[in-house]
UniProtKB/Swiss-Prot annotation:
NCBIfam families: division/cell wall cluster transcriptional repressor MraZ. InterPro entries: MraZ (IPR003444), MraZ_C (IPR035644), MraZ_dom (IPR020603), MraZ_N (IPR035642), MraZ_sf (IPR038619), SpoVT-AbrB_dom (IPR007159), SpoVT-AbrB_sf (IPR037914). Forms oligomers. The lineage of its organism: Bacteria, Pseudomonadati, Pseudomonadota, Gammaproteobacteria, Enterobacterales. It is found in: Cytoplasm, Nucleoid. Pfam families: MraZ (PF02381). GO terms for biological process: negative regulation of DNA-templated transcription initiation. Residues 5-52, 81-124 form the SpoVT-AbrB domain. The keyword Repressor applies. This is Transcriptional regulator MraZ. It comes from Shigella flexneri.
């Protein structure tokens, strides 16, 4: 399980260094193999360990290619999916087209989200957090039943 937000730097080749606390888990569970794709709702990337991505692929394969909305989701997620292998130094190379999609330059937020990471431009991440907090404060009466049952 991945949690927390960590500031990491992209080097001049577009590689990011995976925080040490995640490396062993990624090596054990995925042999360091990851898949990166775009998020279709936000200007960030989604970074999955390969076994988790394979579950997503199975779900995507069940969508109907004749349904235009489902086909569009398949095209966006699979069409942008890029395999990346963690090297001996614990770095992952993020494809240029993906970096461009999310506006990633030097400072990147690596955000743990249970079975995957999100990769955000640092400035965009902070703006999104502010928007999320503001929206949550406005929506106190609009909580779903699942959120109402969540006790923190």
């Amino acid at each position: 399980m991945f949690r927390g937000a960590t500031l990491v730097n992209l080097d001049s080749k577009g590689r990011l260094s995976v925080p040490t606390r995640y490396r062993e888990q990624l090596l054990e569970n995925a042999a360091g193999q990851m898949v990166c794709t775009i998020d279709i709702h936000h200007p960030c990337l989604l970074l999955y360990p390969l076994p988790e991505w394979e579950i997503i692929e199975q779900k995507l394969s069940r969508l109907l290619s004749m349904n235009p909305v489902e086909r569009r989701v398949q095209r966006l997620l699979l069409g942008h999916a890029s395999e990346c292998q963690m090297d001996g130094a614990g770095r992952l190379l993020i494809a240029p087209v993906l970096r461009q999609h999310a506006g990633l330059t030097k400072e990147v937020m690596l955000v743990g989200q249970f079975n995957k990471f999100e990769l955000w431009d640092e400035t965009t991440w902070h703006q999104q957090v502010k928007e999320d907090i503001d929206a949550e404060q406005l929506a106190t009466g609009d909580l779903s039943e699942r959120l109402q049952d969540l006790s923190l």
